[in-house]
C-alpha cells in the first residue's frame, strides 16, 4: 500500500487559505507554502481523542503587511485570523509559522 | 485593521456565534487570582518558559526544541524557571489569554513576552536571542575562576 501524503485540501486547510486570503490579499504574489504535518504527531498526548487529520499545520508566507512588525506581532496577526479554528477542541492544535516581508525573503533567497 | 470588524458569515451562523460567545466567556475566565499567579510565575526568574512537560521530559516537540535552544545558548539554570502547563489546566488556558498567544511553549525574559517556538528559533538563528539573554544577564558566567583578582 502506498502511504497517502497528508492533504492540504481538507476543510480546515481550505478555511486557512480562505482566511489568509482575507487577511493578506498579497500573499499569492510571493512564495507560499501550507503544509499539513498532522501525521507526524498522530496520537500524541495533546491530540488524543482527536481523530481529525488536520491538527498540525505549517505556513510559510510572505506579505508586505509584515513590514515594520516584529515577529510576535506577525504571528499574532495570523493567530487572530485563525482564532476560531484554534479555539476548537477538534481544531488546529499546532501552527508553525514562517512570516517574512518581501525584502526579507529576497535577501534570504540570494 | 487587517481583519474585517464585521464578518457577515459569522452573524448568520448560530453555531459560530455560540462559539464566539464561548470564547468570550473564556476570556472572562481569567480571574484576578490566576492572573496574579501567572504574574508571580513570570517574575520568578529572569527567564521563564511555559511548556508542556518538564525540561528533562518535554511532552511536545515544540517545547523540546525550545528547551534545546535555551540550553544551547547557555542559559544559567539558576536564572531559569519552567512551568508545566499540563499539570494545571488553569495555567494552560490562563497563560494563553494572559499572553494573547494561543500556543505553548511561551517564553518570557525579564517579564517581557518574547514568543513561541518559531519566534525563538528564528531569533536563535539571527543572534537576537543571544543578545537578549546576555542583556538580561541570564547566561552561565564565563569561566572566572582563574581571574580572581578582585
What kind of region is each of these model predictions?
Chain B
Residues 1-33:
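N-terminal mitochondrial targeting presequence
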Residues 34-36, 92-94:
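Eukaryotic intrinsically disordered and solvent-exposed regulatory patches
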Residues 38-78:
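Local sequence-structure signature of Cys/Sec-based thiol-disulfide redox active-site neighborhoods
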Residues 49, 70, 80, 104-107, ...:
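Structural signal for hydrophobic/aromatic residues that build the beta-strand cores
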Residues 81-86:
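Residue-level recognition of beta-strand->loop/alpha-helix junctions
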Residues 87-91:
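Short acidic loop-to-helix transition motifs that present clustered carboxylates
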Residues 97-102:
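Thiol/disulfide oxidoreductase modules built on the thioredoxin-like
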Residues 109-144:
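Non-catalytic, surface beta->alpha helical segment in thiol-disulfide oxidoreductase systems
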